[in-house]
């Protein structure tokens, strides 16, 4: 049986692992046992990688995704079409859309979505940084690329209202994406079709 100090350290590890998505107490406990019993070297590498990421990874000054410099590779790429800005929930969405090869414009990453059940309101979606991103640019069309979930739809509605009186054409991905589907789990073909067949919300001009 663990003494109290070791028990405290073990419980602290479990508590830390529980912050990961979809990891409950039992899953966290299994992971903790696995790391301590069978994967100590890998656990040390994990700690080192996490500490390095915490020191070096920042938000892109332009699109708000994660990067290690001032600008991410996409924002720094002068060949991208700066007239079209796609607004997504998280960095994984950018990766998936890039893999589908269906958007050659730029992105803005909200780093959150509205979830009233969890107390996540408009402050969760970085509208202030989005407003800064729009200043002085060449943007003509904004593509809302949130998921067709309750949270994604709520976020899309708030974004539509935010853009309503601004001089941009606004569209949203078509509902070829399954209802309740997160972009993270949508195959490349379906995602590309949703981009190409996106639904117009408003024409350009205030």
Curated annotation (Swiss-Prot):
Keyword field: DNA damage, DNA recombination, DNA repair, Metal-binding, Zinc, Zinc-finger
Zinc finger (C4-type): 60-75
Residues annotated as domain Toprim: 83-178
UniProt-listed GO biological process terms: DNA recombination; DNA repair
Entry's Gene Ontology molecular function annotations: DNA binding; zinc ion binding
Stored Pfam families: RecR_C, RecR_HhH, RecR_ZnF, Toprim_4
Main function: May play a role in DNA repair. It seems to be involved in an RecBC-independent recombinational process of DNA repair. It may act with RecF and RecO.
Family: Belongs to the RecR family.
Name of protein: Recombination protein RecR
């Amino acid at each position: 049986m663990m003494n109290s100090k070791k028990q405290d350290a073990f419980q602290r590890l479990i508590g830390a692992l529980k912050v990961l998505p979809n990891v409950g107490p039992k899953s966290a406990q299994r992971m903790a046992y696995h790391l301590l019993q069978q994967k100590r070297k890998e656990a040390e590498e994990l700690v080192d990688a996490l500490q390095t990421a915490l020191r070096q990874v920042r938000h892109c000054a332009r699109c708000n995704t994660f990067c290690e410099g001032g600008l991410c590779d996409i924002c720094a790429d002068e060949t991208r079409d700066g007239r079209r800005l796609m607004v997504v929930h998280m960095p994984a969405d950018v990766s998936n859309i890039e893999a589908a090869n269906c958007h050659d414009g730029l992105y803005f990453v909200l780093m959150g979505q509205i979830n009233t059940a969890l107390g996540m309101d408009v402050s969760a979606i970085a509208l202030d940084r989005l407003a800064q991103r729009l200043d002085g640019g060449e943007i003509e069309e904004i593509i809302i690329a949130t998921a067709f979930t309750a949270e994604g739809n709520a976020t899309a509605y708030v974004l539509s209202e935010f853009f309503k009186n601004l001089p941009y054409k606004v569209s949203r991905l078509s509902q070829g994406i399954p209802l309740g589907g997160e972009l993270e789990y949508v195959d490349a073909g379906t995602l590309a079709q949703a981009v190409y067949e996106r639904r117009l919300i408003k024409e350009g001009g205030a």
